[in-house]
């Protein structure tokens, strides 16, 4: 645990980048972008999901497991040196090789002294056309976590986790003042004309809602560029648009949709107190009535009824 008093304000850097086919080049670019963000004043820098490679989960190919690395490993060591040199906290998403045949989509948290604070393993793993992640990644088994760093207590989740309010809530309830979502998301080119705007809006809206519901900052950090797994495939056009939302859900900084960018913006912890005083959602939660959330689906009426507060409980709240 970091014993220093966290700052009341600091600057965050969101690194949006296109990935080349060369993992070593991508790592060099990431290190340079960390330095660029730090030079612009950032004290916390987040990289995109699986930044070391192009998005390989567009196809199922066992040879691509060779892209994985241990933690600690080459990526965390290089970024640890960069973090220490620049004095910044770094979120480093990696394809983690945990053991032979066991892999995770993970995010390492590196403190400003270069030390590895901890690791988050992606909890929600998709299996959709061109997002065949279940072939590669075991679901996370570390739970939703927070990390004490030089900039205070932060939480990181990964990409598909951003669609689930439960993960955001459980992370915020542990005291995180910011939720970071390193991401790899984009359009199927054939759908862009008809659904593209709605898909991008939904992606931003769900994460803004996490900021509002929990009274925290939310940062989504995406890759950019059109990646094809082979010469004939349509591939994915990653939509960039990395952004920071404040505790009121306002988008206060955003990257373009079509190019690399390092976006920096102030995080002010006083805004959290301001938001939660005006919108006391944490105060008004009915934790006695949410048992049904631990079930896959409430198929039977008696099960649903059993999760309602009793008359005695209701009377005690008056």
What are these regions (language model features)?
Residues 106, 119-122, 241, 254, ...:
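Residue-level detector of high-confidence beta-strand sites
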Residues 144-177, 183, 272-303:
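Cysteine/selenocysteine-centered motifs that mediate thiol-based redox chemistry or coordinate metal-sulfur cofactors
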Residues 9-21, 106, 119-122, 146, ...:
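Active-site-proximal beta-strand elements of phosphoester/diester hydrolases
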Residues 23, 32-113, 117-119, 185-209, ...:
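Cys-nucleophile CN-hydrolase/nitrilase-fold catalytic domain and related Cys-dependent amidase chemistry
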Residues 12, 109-117, 243-252:
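Short, glycine-anchored, charge-dense loop/turn motifs used at functional sites
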Residues 68-91, 159-262:
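CN hydrolase (nitrilase-like) catalytic-core segments centered on the catalytic cysteine
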Residues 122-136, 259-276:
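A short, polar/charged loop-to-alpha-helix boundary motif
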Residues 1-4, 301-318:
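Short, basic, low-complexity termini and linkers enriched in Ser/Thr/Gly/Pro
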């Amino acid at each position: 645990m970091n014993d220093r008093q966290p700052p009341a304000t600091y600057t965050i850097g969101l690194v949006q980048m296109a990935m080349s086919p060369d993992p070593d080049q991508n790592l060099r670019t990431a290190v340079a972008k960390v330095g660029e963000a730090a030079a612009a004043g950032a004290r916390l820098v987040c990289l995109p999901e699986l930044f070391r490679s192009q998005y390989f989960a567009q196809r199922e190919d066992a040879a691509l497991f060779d892209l994985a690395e241990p933690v600690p490993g080459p990526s965390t060591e290089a970024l640890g040196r960069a973090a220490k040199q620049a004095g910044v906290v770094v979120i480093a998403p990696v394809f983690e090789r945990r053991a032979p045949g066991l892999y995770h989509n993970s995010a390492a948290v590196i403190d400003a002294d270069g030390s590895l604070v901890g690791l988050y393993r992606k909890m929600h793993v998709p299996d959709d056309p061109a997002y065949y992640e279940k072939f590669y990644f075991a679901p996370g088994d570390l739970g939703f976590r927070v990390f004490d760093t030089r900039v205070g207590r932060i939480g990181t989740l990964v990409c598909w986790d951003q669609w689930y309010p439960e993960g955001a809530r459980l992370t915020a309830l542990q005291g995180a003042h910011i939720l970071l979502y390193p991401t790899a998301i984009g359009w199927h080119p054939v759908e862009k004309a008809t659904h593209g705007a709605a898909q991008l809006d939904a992606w931003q809206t769900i994460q803004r809602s996490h900021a509002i519901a929990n009274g925290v900052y939310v940062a989504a950090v995406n890759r950019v560029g059109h990646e094809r797994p082979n010469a004939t495939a349509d591939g994915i056009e990653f939509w960039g648009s990395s952004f920071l939302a404040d505790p009121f859900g306002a988008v206060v900084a955003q990257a373009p949709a079509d190019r690399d960018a390092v976006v920096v913006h102030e995080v002010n912890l006083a805004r959290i107190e301001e938001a939660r005083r005006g919108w006391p959602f944490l105060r008004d939660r009915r934790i006695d009535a949410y048992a049904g959330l631990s079930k896959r689906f409430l198929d039977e009426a008696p099960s649903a009824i059993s999760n309602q507060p009793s008359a005695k409980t209701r009377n005690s709240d008056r």
